[in-house]
Design a protein with these regions (language model features):
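A hydrophobic/aromatic-rich effector-binding and dimerization subdomain
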Residues: 1-24, 72-141, 164-169
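Short, conserved beta-strand element in jelly-roll/cupin
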Residues: 34-50, 66
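Regular secondary-structure segments
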Residues: 44, 131-142, 187, 191-194, ...
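Short acidic-glycine-tyrosine-enriched beta hairpin
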Residues: 54-68
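All-alpha amphipathic helical-bundle segments outside canonical DNA-binding/catalytic cores
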Residues: 125, 141-157, 177
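Hydrophobic alpha-helical core bundles mediating ligand binding, dimerization, or RNAP-core interactions
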Residues: 130, 134-138, 155-163, 179, ...
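Basic/polar phosphate-binding segments, predominantly the helix-turn-helix DNA-binding elements
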Residues: 161-167, 185, 189-193, 197-233, ...
């Protein structure tokens, strides 16, 4: 069961979203679940197993889990008492292009990769500060008159705690470079136009760079390959349509998400999610 707590949207789409998830006990299939959005999860009750890449974490109440963009994670086991959690997702562009705080100067790849020594699970006894901020954000979303600046301020404090107290990020809070700005502009363009027939030449041309140099720069600055980023955006959109738009067939969904044929769509979807679009549409499990 999913209970939407609230979201903050801009003209470019949903910026931040928070919801509560309740999952019944039992084993769950391993799905290569990942997304561009940065994720922070609070376990409020129950137990289970989180599979993150090659690691497995025993889930316990009041723990915090943190997942970078495109980091594969999946709950593969839920204990006999079920599992209850609150998820917070925010887009990388939340950190980009703002002038009112130093978080806008975090390296572009903050959301895409963390320190190699960072553990995805923050134990309950070390998570008190983040848990308190997280709970306050959920309470703000539950109010009838939401004040977006409050939720965003709380998120800022959570990010600062991850950097300062838990060694999430090795990078420095330095001023953005021209290269950072180029890649930020490119990702914003992709986010708005991923449904279209994007080409390397088009994206490179927006920045006045050669295709080879632009492709290399995108990977270096963002920490993710250009076409992996584009396909992730397209697959995320396809997953939403597969679950929420039963009137659309798979060919129509592929077209709406920027794939020029179903063969490419099926291949990209299975590579990302681990199952075919048809299997995903028929599955009853909430992928978390």
């Amino acid at each position: 069961m999913i209970n939407e707590l609230g979201e903050i949207s801009t003209s470019g789409g949903v910026l931040l979203k928070m919801w509560e998830v309740i999952v019944q006990s039992g084993s769950r299939p391993l799905v290569r679940h990942s997304h561009i959005r940065f994720e922070i999860t609070l376990i409020t009750a129950g137990s289970g197993i989180y599979t993150v890449g090659d690691k497995k974490y025993a889930i316990k109440p009041y723990e915090i889990f943190v997942f970078a963009s495109n980091e594969q994670h999946c709950v593969t086991e839920v204990g006999k008492d079920g599992l209850k959690m609150i998820n917070l997702h925010f887009e990388p562009r939340y950190l980009w292009g703002r002038s009112f705080d130093r978080l806008s100067n975090v390296n572009t790849n903050f959301c895409f990769q963390h320190s190699p020594n960072f553990e995805n699970c923050i134990p309950a006894d070390r998570a008190r500060q983040i848990r308190g901020l997280f709970t306050s954000a959920a309470e703000e979303f539950s109010k009838k008159e939401q004040r977006n600046e409050v939720q965003l301020c709380l998120l800022n404090m959570i990010i600062v705690a991850l950097i300062r107290d838990f060694g999430y990020f090795d990078g420095a809070l330095s001023a953005p470079t021209d290269k950072n700005r180029i890649i930020r502009k490119a990702t914003e363009y992709i986010d708005m136009h991923f449904q279209e027939n994007l080409t390397l030449e088009t994206l490179a041309g927006l920045s006045g760079l050669t295709p080879n140099y632009f492709s290399s720069l995108f990977s270096k600055v963002s920490g993710i390959k250009l076409w992996d980023y584009i396909n992730s955006r397209r697959i995320e959109a396809a997953m939403q349509l597969l679950k929420n738009e039963s009137n659309l067939n798979i060919i129509e969904i592929a077209s709406k998400c920027g794939f020029n044929n179903t063969a490419n769509f099926n291949k990209a979807f299975k590579k990302t999610v681990g199952i075919t679009p048809g299997e995903y549409r028929l599955s009853d499990n909430i992928i978390i």
